Each structure stands twice: as structure tokens, then as C-alpha cells.
């Protein structure tokens, strides 16, 4: 037993030793990778990057930047790369002692140092590339500025007449660029690449602005010297022609406004000659806005005249229509009020319309007189005609509505008479059906309903013979009688159907009287109720009796009655 225990312990120890050596082998691979990485980053070309700056002017800002990067390279080597060898050596020693965690910590520190060293290299590479790119951009901008300088100078010299009095100032501004180009060369020669960039970039923007001025100035001069004076002249003579045609344009104030605009235009060229183009554009925009306002007023007058010519005849027709309709209404009201009741307000409205129409005709005559003058402000005439058109349209609508009302009175009377005749005819027809039916007697309530309808009809007939007739009241009464008649007819139909049905049930049940005493008793009661005009109750008792001996037969009998 002891032997087995000893063997087990030995096996465990051997396994543990094997595991330790296996782990140390894995950790050894990590250390070897760190050594390989160290060998790779030692070859990073810090010096080659810096050597690219030697191709530039190693002075001034360039020299300062070069020295700073060289110093950073030395510091990075001492701070990040030099300790790596020691960290790797310590990791190997600790690994030999099987101190895995401590060995891993040393390797991690070594990798962090190498990461920092690589980052330092990347930063140096970016800085060098940035300096080289800035040098290249500076040279490109400088070459562009030299070309622009020569072209602008040549343009002013060759096309001096296009720039007017601004040509001298343009030449002066262009000449200022030459010493600034030379200053760039000095900054570049001194290695001050950042100052050189800021200087040449600012110079390029100023040249672009002056170039835009040179493109804009000929347009401004052409607008100032030719286009606007031409528009002033066209507007002046155009208004003169319109006045000859009969337009009143005093409110446009053409002469005074044009004189004011000419004065304002005279200040524009001095602004252009001083290269104050923003102020010059503002003044020109203001002049054009005022011109547009004048053109809008004139165009409004021309359109107003066309509109006046189109609407004048329409308004004339509408006024005549209103007057004729008013006369017709006055005549018709006098006739209608003898036969029909008419609200006094309707008659007053017709008289009021007459006064309003006469007033509108007077206004229209004044407008026509105004239009016959040698100078007419058509915009005012248009407004006045619009006022007339709106009012005469309202009057015509109201008069037409009133006329339709008068016509409707006759139609309503005829409709009421027709409805009354139909009521009388229908009433007699229904009553005859009641008398000719199998009823033992006409129920008293139908006699009462018939008498009520007769009374209402006589009352309405008396109102028809009276004059003037209040058509609305009469129509309402006839409508009420029609409702009474419908009720009379519906209830009569119900009674007639129930009477036939009750009679059929009793007749059918007679076959069971001998054999079923209870049926005989029920049918006797149903006959008694039938004679007393209680048809619904008679039906209930007869149905119960028949269903007790022949289920479902009552439904068959009812269907036959309905078909009849």
C-alpha cells in the first residue's frame, strides 16, 4: 500500500514537472517574439526621414523643427528602445526560475515600450511629410500668384478702357503684389516655411479678390454708363407715349424720380474708381428696385385699362338687368300681394334695391365721364368698377332669390291643392273599403278619424277661398292633413287584414268544434270578440285553439291571407 502511495506521488511530481517545462516552453516563444520585434523596430529609418529635410533650406523654422525632431528621436531611443533589452533579459532570467507571472510582466513592459517607440516614429514621419507637403503647396501657390500677377498686369494694360477711372488704382494695387512675392522668396530662403505659407496664402486670396473686381468692374461700368441711362430714356419716352394715349401717370412721378435716380447714379462711378464695389452694387440695386417699382405702377395702369375695357360692357348689362328685374318685381309684388300674404320686408327690400340701383347707375355715369377725359387713371377706374360689379352682383342675387320666392308661392299653392284633392280621394276610397269589408260594423275610431279629416279639409278649403292666402301656413296644414290621412289608411289596412285573418281562423276551426269542446268554446269567444270589433284578441284566442289541435296551421293561414 505504501509502495502505491509513493508511486502515485512520484507520478504527480513528474506530471507537475512536465507541466512546468511545457509552460516555460510557451513563455519562451513569447520572449522570442519580443526579441524579433525589437530587432525589427531597431531598423526603423528615423535618420532617413530626417535626411529628407536636408533637401530643403535647413534654416529658420525648418532648422528649428529639424533639431526638435532629432532631439525627439534621441529621447525616444533612450526612453523607449534602450530599456527593452534589459526587460527581455530579466524576463529570461525569471523564466529560468519558473517565475511565469513576473516574466510575463517584464515582457508586457517591453511591448509597451516598443509601442511607444513605434508611435514616436509615426509622429516623426507625419511631421516630415507635413513639412515637405507645405513646401510643395507653397511653391504651387507662389507659381500661381506669379502667373496671376503677370496676367492681371497685362489685362489692365491691354483693356484699360474697360476699367475706366479704376484702371490707375488697379495698376497700383497690382504693383503692390511684386514686393510681396519677393518677400515670400526671402521667407522661403530663410527656411521659415510656416510664415511663407501664411504669407503666400494671404497674397493668393487678395489676388483672387482683385481678379474678381477686374471681372466685375466692366459689368458695373457698362450698367452705369449705358444700361441704366438707356432705361431712364426708354421709361421717359414710354411714359410720354402713354400719356398721349390717355393714361394719367402723375402718381408715378416719372420726371422727378428719374432725376433723383440720375443723381444717385452719378455717385456710382466714383465708388467704382475707388474699388468700393460693395457700396456701388448697393446703390445700383437700390436704383434698379426703384425702376422696378415705377415699371410695376405703369404695368398696373396698362393692365387696368385692359380690364376696364373687358368689364365695362358686363357691368352695363348687369345694371340694366338689375333695373329691369327690379321693375318686374315691383309690378309682380303688387299683383301677388292681392292673392298671397307677403312679408312687408320683401316689399321694402325691392324699394331699397331700386334706390341702390339708381345710386350705382349714377356712380357708373360719373365713371364714364371720368373715362371720357384726356387723361385717365385706369387703376382708380378699375377699383370703382370692381366696387360696382360686386354690389350689382349682390343685388341681382337677392332680387333673383325674391323672384323665385314669388314664383314658389304659386307653385306651393298648386301643390297644396293637389295634395288636398288626393287626400279627399284616398279618404273616400279607404272608407268604402271599410264599408265593403267583412267587418260587422265600421269601428267608431275610424268614423272619428274620417270626420276629423273632413273637418280639416273643409277648413283648408275655406282658407283657399280667402285672399290673400298665407301660403306657408296653408302648406303646413295640408302637410298635417296628409299625415292624418296616412295614419287613417295604415290603421284601416291593419284592421281589414286582421278581420280577414280572424274570419279565416274561425272558419277553419269549425271542423274541430264537434270533436274538441275546448276548441268550440274558444271559437265562440273569438266570434264574440269579432262582433265587437276586437279582431286582434279574437286572432289570439283562435290561434291558440287551432295550434292545440293542428300545430303550424295558423302560419299557413296567415300566409294565404297576406298573399290575397
Curated annotation (Swiss-Prot):
Disulfide bonds: none annotated. The chain crosses the membrane at residues 5-23. HAMAP family: EzrA (MF_00728). It is found in: Cell membrane. Negative regulator of FtsZ ring formation; modulates the frequency and position of FtsZ ring formation. Inhibits FtsZ ring formation at polar sites. Interacts either with FtsZ or with one of its binding partners to promote depolymerization. Residues 24-564 are cytoplasmic. Residues 99-138, 190-223, 271-300, 350-435, 471-550 form a coiled coil. Belongs to the EzrA family. One of its GO terms (biological process) is division septum assembly. Its main location: membrane. This is Septation ring formation regulator EzrA. It is a single-pass membrane protein. GO terms for cellular component: plasma membrane; septin ring. Residues 1-4 are extracellular. Keywords: Cell cycle, Cell division, Cell membrane, Coiled coil, Membrane, Septation, Transmembrane, Transmembrane helix. It comes from Staphylococcus aureus (strain NCTC 8325 / PS 47). Pfam families: EzrA.
Amino acid at each position: 500500500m505504501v509502495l502505491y502511495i509513493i508511486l502515485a506521488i512520484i507520478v504527480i511530481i513528474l506530471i507537475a514537472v512536465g507541466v512546468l517545462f511545457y509552460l516555460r516552453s510557451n513563455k519562451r516563444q513569447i520572449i522570442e517574439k519580443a526579441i524579433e520585434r525589437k530587432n525589427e523596430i531597431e531598423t526603423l529609418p528615423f535618420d532617413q526621414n530626417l535626411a529628407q529635410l536636408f533637401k530643403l533650406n535647413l534654416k529658420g523654422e525648418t532648422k528649428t523643427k529639424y533639431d526638435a525632431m532629432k532631439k525627439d528621436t534621441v529621447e525616444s531611443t533612450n526612453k523607449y528602445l534602450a530599456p527593452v533589452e534589459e526587460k527581455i533579459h530579466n524576463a529570461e532570467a525569471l523564466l529560468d526560475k519558473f517565475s511565469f507571472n513576473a516574466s510575463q510582466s517584464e515582457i508586457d513592459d517591453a511591448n509597451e515600450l516598443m509601442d511607444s517607440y513605434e508611435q514616436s516614429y509615426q509622429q516623426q514621419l507625419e511631421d516630415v511629410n507635413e513639412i515637405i507637403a507645405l513646401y510643395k503647396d507653397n511653391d504651387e501657390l507662389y507659381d500661381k500668384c506669379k502667373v496671376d500677377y503677370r496676367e492681371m498686369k497685362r489685362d489692365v494694360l491691354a483693356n484699360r478702357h474697360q476699367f475706366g477711372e479704376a484702371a490707375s488704382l488697379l495698376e497700383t494695387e497690382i504693383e503692390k503684389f511684386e514686393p510681396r512675392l519677393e518677400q515670400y522668396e526671402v521667407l522661403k530662403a530663410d527656411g521659415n516655411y510656416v510664415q511663407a505659407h501664411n504669407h503666400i496664402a494671404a497674397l493668393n486670396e487678395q489676388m483672387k479678390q482683385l481678379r474678381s473686381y477686374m471681372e466685375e468692374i466692366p459689368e458695373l461700368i457698362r450698367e452705369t454708363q449705358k444700361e441704366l441711362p438707356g432705361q431712364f430714356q426708354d421709361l421717359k419716352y414710354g411714359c410720354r407715349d402713354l400719356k398721349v394715349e390717355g393714361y394719367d401717370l402723375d402718381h408715378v412721378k416719372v420726371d422727378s424720380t428719374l432725376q433723383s435716380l440720375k443723381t444717385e447714379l452719378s455717385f456710382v462711378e466714383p465708388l467704382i474708381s475707388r474699388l468700393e464695389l460693395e457700396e456701388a452694387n448697393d446703390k445700383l440695386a437700390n436704383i434698379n428696385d426703384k425702376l422696378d417699382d415705377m415699371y410695376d405702377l405703369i404695368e398696373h395702369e396698362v393692365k387696368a385699362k385692359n380690364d376696364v375695357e373687358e368689364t365695362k360692357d358686363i357691368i352695363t348689362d348687369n345694371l340694366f338687368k338689375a333695373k329691369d328685374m327690379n321693375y318686374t318685381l315691383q309690378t309682380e309684388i303688387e299683383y301677388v300681394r292681392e292673392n298671397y300674404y307677403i312679408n312687408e320686408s320683401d316689399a321694402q327690400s325691392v324699394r331699397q334695391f331700386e334706390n341702390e340701383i339708381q345710386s350705382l347707375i349714377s356712380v357708373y355715369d360719373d365713371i364714364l365721364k371720368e373715362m371720357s377725359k384726356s387723361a385717365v387713371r385706369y387703376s382708380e377706374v378699375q377699383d370703382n368698377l370692381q366696387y360696382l360689379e360686386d354690389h350689382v352682383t349682390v343685388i341681382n342675387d337677392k332680387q333673383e332669390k325674391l323672384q323665385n320666392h314669388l314664383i314658389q308661392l304659386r307653385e306651393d299653392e298648386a301643390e297644396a291643392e293637389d295634395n288636398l284633392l288626393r287626400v279627399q280621394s284616398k279618404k273616400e276610397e279607404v272608407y268604402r273599403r271599410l264599408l265593403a269589408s267583412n267587418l260587422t260594423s265600421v269601428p267608431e275610431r275610424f268614423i272619428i278619424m274620417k270626420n276629423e279629416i273632413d273637418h280639416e279639409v273643409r277648413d283648408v278649403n275655406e282658407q283657399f277661398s280667402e285672399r290673400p292666402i298665407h301660403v306657408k301656413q296653408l302648406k303646413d296644414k295640408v302637410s298635417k292633413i296628409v299625415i292624418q290621412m296616412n295614419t287613417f289608411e295604415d290603421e284601416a289596412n291593419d284592421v281589414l287584414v286582421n278581420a280577414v285573418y280572424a274570419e279565416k281562423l274561425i272558419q277553419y276551426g269549425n271542423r274541430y268544434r264537434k270533436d274538441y269542446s275546448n276548441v268550440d268554446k274558444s271559437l265562440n269567444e273569438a266570434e264574440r270578440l269579432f262582433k265587437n270589433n276586437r279582431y286582434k284578441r279574437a286572432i289570439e284566442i283562435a290561434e291558440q285553439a287551432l295550434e292545440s289541435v293542428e300545430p303550424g296551421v295558423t302560419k299557413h293561414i296567415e300566409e294565404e291571407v297576406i298573399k290575397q
